Amino acid sequence: MAMLNGTFKSIAPLISDEERQIYEIVTLVVISSAIGLFGLGANIINIIVFVRQGLNNSVNIGFMGLAISDLLSLVTIEWYCISFNPLFINSDINFFPPDVQHLSGGHPHGCFARITAWVTAYITFERCLCITFPLKVKQILTPRRTLIILIAIYFIVMLPMLPEYATAYIGLKYFPFLNKTLYGLVFTSERYKVDGLSFLLFAILMFVSFVAVIVCTAVLVVKLNQKSQWRQKSTFDSAQSEIMSRRDRSTMKTVILIASVLIINYSPTVVFFTGVFIVPEFNITGQHRNLFLVSAAFCFIFDTLNSSVTIISYYTMSSKFRQTFHELFSLCLRKKNHSELKTELEKDHADSNTKL
């Protein structure tokens, strides 16, 4: 522990306030914002595709729940990133964006990111049940029950936000470095009683969901391997066996892709939260504040990436998604062409009337 503390003490002075601001501009204002804009469009498309396919099965309902949490996560993180844009901060507005974003951007994003993790854990668990109890799973996890479970996930994960919103609000305060009185983050006199509680609860939710996804995915991969081997041995028709084998491999690749995306993108956040708990002064008000903020901004890149690339997974692995996706854009293209043709005809008609 002493060695770890010494390491952080040697690193922290290297990050000055000016350097921290540069890191925040690059990671938040540039990188995360760009990825987030793509993700917003991608998740809107995901939602439209799943609605067109129909929300009459537990799989589509689960994916819809994931798309909604991803969309809300990206909306809040986009606002968070805008709040650190120097042009916005120095504009003539009556509030200080880095202060206001805590309750309107940063904290809600943390909540929706945890919801995404738990919905992913549920989807992985559901797939695990499908391969373990294929004949009973449709009776166990009906569309109605899946919807109730997703609503429960949203509700439970939102509960840790209560202590934060009960002891903090947006109000007028004086900013000495600006020599202005602006709207900013203000704490109540009861703040000390719950300080850090929301952060702790979100950390616990993140660790548990992270482990749950890893465990369920590992079980699913093992079960798929067993099922694939059993089918190859027990099926006499080689062509049918090959079809089953391809289906199993496709499902396995989907699971591996989903697990890899989640594990890779959440690993930096897991390391970040671990550092907060084991390294003294590595927090928003501690000696290593700048290092804390730079690390948090770095983690936001991966949060944004995780919520933005699901459309690639669906499009690559699901032929049904690809078909609906192509139908959707074909419809949009036909409408555009029809609109352009109608405009041209109206223009020609107007020109003819003018000549007459």
Give each language-model segment a name:
Residues 1-42, 85:
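Extracellular N-terminal segment of 7TM GPCRs
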Residues 8-17, 87-111, 159-208, 281-283:
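Loop architecture of class A 7-transmembrane GPCRs
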Residues 21-33, 59-124, 130-133:
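Extracellular TM2-ECL1-early TM3 structural module of rhodopsin-like
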Residues 212-213, 261-264, 270-274, 294-344:
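Seventh transmembrane helix
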Residues 72-76, 83-86, 108, 112-122, ...:
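Fourth transmembrane helix
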Residues 69, 186, 219-271:
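Intracellular effector-coupling site of seven-transmembrane GPCRs
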Residues 2, 32-36, 72-92, 113, ...:
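Helix-to-loop junction signature of class
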Residues 1-15, 226-252, 285, 319-356:
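Intrinsically disordered regulatory tails of 7TM GPCRs
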